[in-house]
């Protein structure tokens, strides 16, 4: 075991018993988090002053249906937390506009690969500073990736496909960063454009706030002071209430032209309240409204509704423990789900049937993947074969604020009652829910089902599936919240990671998709969602990207006539 392996083993021990909720509680107990976390020496923005700021045309206000639960870019793996982080944090490169396979320079001004794409070299942009004024050079970029990989949380599993040891990343001079993958890795470029994980942090500042060997993680979950390079700084974070970004005057991109000075995120869980706020002009952007709310807003000429299919698949995680421990029991759940009623009756055309666990927009999707229908007789037979008796109690846990998902769960509840299964639906706040998804409690202590949705970090089916179902992605290591583990699936993942032959690569991905859908279900994959974003019609510069779902490039957005 290398020095890195020993270090990583020690750190995984430190992190494995923690989840985001426990870290937040620990930070609060240590006095890190006042009632409203205030950053950068600025005072809290009161409700009254928030309303005044919203009236400022240079302020963009977004109503979110749930609160960010984490501000550390090296652990964030949910989109509500990722949404504001596009303001303060940047990567080496990014996706270009709405493209899923074209890239633009950000902190790196240029990059190239050797002939077999096993070594990638990035030249850093000159003159970039962190928000504390310190320079961004190749060494601090290397240190940022070392922190990310060594912590080993959430999105780090995606990077370990390409880089297993931080020693594979070097900084031979002040402006050059080299990634030596050891094997041909043509997808490293795609990975480094992701909004989850490969973002550059000012590690020396984080380490000044280290506690018990956590790399400053507990502090960075609630603070961004001096850590980022982006056009905006986080100046206030009041969990479950609001988060405020203000522009960083010394941003390397400059401030010529029309830009927002401030971005306010208001946490409004009630669907009807968010709809009223966008109608009344009290907020500029909302998403995740119900189909009924979107239809009610369609005739409003003051609003623009963007409807775009994305890389997202919606599903119910099936925990591989207790009554659902066997493939037969999980197959029964898949046969019992009311697919047509949910798609047509609940989502009203804002989604379509998923074909397995991968969106049709993602490279590696197999359209021949097995697709269930609703058949309660088959479900009943499979439950009997799995020795799951009538009267069995199951719990489905979901995040509050998703009225459409709740309606779908209630229809499922009705179907299960017809075959003798009692399903309880439990709604919890985002922080509690991400504790279930990313926490490390045993499978036996988890809900039997969890309503979740997922899209890839970059445009690749392997990446889409690996965090959800790989045996080493349980709990805080990824998003395998059901503790699924299939030996054949893991064998295919391990054999295919570096597969250079496109045909063999696709064959392995197709087999994985069939196994998790038909033979040994990991989840009930029921819908490919049509993502909707409602904007006031004076907001310019919004571009939907099917991979970067639920985030906004605030720097290129503006308000008409406010220059």
List the model feature ranges, each with a label.
Residues 96-98, 195-255, 262, 270, ...:
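Gly/Pro-rich hinge or "lid" segments in bacterial periplasmic/extracellular proteins
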Residues 63-115, 146, 227-231:
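N-terminal lobe/hinge region of extracytoplasmic solute-binding protein
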Residues 1-22, 26-37, 44-45:
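N-terminal secretory signal peptides
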Residues 232, 352-385, 400-407:
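Structural transition elements
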Residues 220, 250-296, 422:
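Ligand-site clamp/hinge motif
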């Amino acid at each position: 075991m290398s020095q890195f392996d020993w270090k990583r083993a020690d750190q995984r021990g430190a992190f494995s018993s923690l989840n985001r909720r426990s870290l937040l509680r620990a930070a609060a107990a240590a006095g890190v988090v006042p009632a409203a976390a205030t950053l950068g020496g600025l005072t809290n923005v009161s409700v009254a002053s928030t309303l005044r700021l919203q009236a400022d045309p240079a302020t963009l206000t977004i109503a979110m249906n749930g609160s960010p639960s984490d501000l550390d870019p090296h652990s964030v793996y949910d989109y509500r937390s990722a949404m504001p982080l596009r303001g303060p944090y940047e990567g080496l490169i990014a996706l270009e506009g709405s493209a899923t396979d074209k890239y633009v320079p950000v902190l790196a001004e240029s990059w190239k690969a050797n002939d077999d794409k096993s070594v990638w070299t990035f030249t850093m942009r000159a003159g970039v500073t962190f928000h504390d004024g310190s320079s961004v050079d190749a060494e601090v970029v290397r240190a940022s990736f070392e922190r990310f990989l060594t912590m080993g949380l959430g999105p780090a599993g995606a990077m370990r496909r390409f880089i297993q040891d931080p020693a594979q990343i070097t900084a031979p001079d002040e402006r050059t960063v080299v990634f030596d993958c050891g094997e041909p890795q043509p997808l490293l470029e795609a990975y480094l454009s992701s909004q989850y994980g490969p973002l550059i942090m000012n590690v020396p500042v984080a380490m000044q706030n280290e506690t018990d060997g956590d790399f400053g993680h507990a502090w960075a979950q609630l603070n961004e002071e001096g850590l980022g390079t982006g056009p905006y700084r986080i100046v206030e974070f009041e969990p479950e209430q609001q988060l405020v970004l203000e522009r960083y005057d010394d941003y390397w991109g400059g401030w010529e032209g029309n830009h927002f000075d401030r971005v306010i995120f208001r946490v409004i869980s009630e669907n009807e309240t968010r709809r009223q706020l966008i109608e009344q002009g009290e907020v500029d952007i909302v998403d995740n409204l119900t189909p009924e709310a979107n239809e009610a807003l369609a005739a409003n000429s003051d609003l623009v509704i963007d409807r775009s299919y994305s890389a997202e698949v919606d599903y119910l995680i099936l925990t591989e423990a207790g009554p659902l421990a066997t493939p037969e029991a999980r197959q029964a759940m898949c046969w019992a789900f009311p697919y047509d009623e949910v798609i047509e009756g609940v989502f009203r055309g804002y989604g379509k049937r998923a074909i397995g666990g991968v969106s049709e927009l993602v490279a590696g999707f197999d359209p021949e993947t097995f697709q269930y229908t609703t058949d309660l007789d088959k479900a009943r037979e499979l439950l009997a074969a799995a020795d799951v008796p009538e009267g069995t109690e199951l719990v489905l846990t979901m995040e509050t604020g998703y009225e459409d998902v709740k309606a779908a769960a209630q229809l499922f509840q009705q179907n299960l009652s017809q075959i003798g299964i009692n399903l309880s639906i439990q709604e919890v706040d985002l922080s509690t829910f991400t504790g279930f998804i990313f926490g490390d409690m045993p499978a036996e202590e988890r809900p039997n089902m969890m309503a979740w949705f997922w899209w890839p970090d970059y445009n690749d089916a392997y990446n889409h599936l690996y965090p959800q179902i790989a045996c080493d992605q349980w709990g805080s290591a990824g998003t395998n919240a059901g503790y699924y583990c299939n030996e054949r699936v893991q064998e295919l993942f391990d054999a295919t990671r570096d597969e250079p032959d496109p045909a063999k690569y696709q064959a392995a991905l197709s087999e994985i998709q069939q196994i998790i859908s038909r033979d040994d279900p990991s989840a009930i994959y029921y819908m490919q969602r049509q993502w909707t974003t409602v904007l006031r019609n004076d907001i310019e510069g919004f571009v939907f990207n099917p991979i970067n779902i639920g985030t906004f490039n605030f720097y290129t957005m503006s308000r008409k006539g406010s220059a």
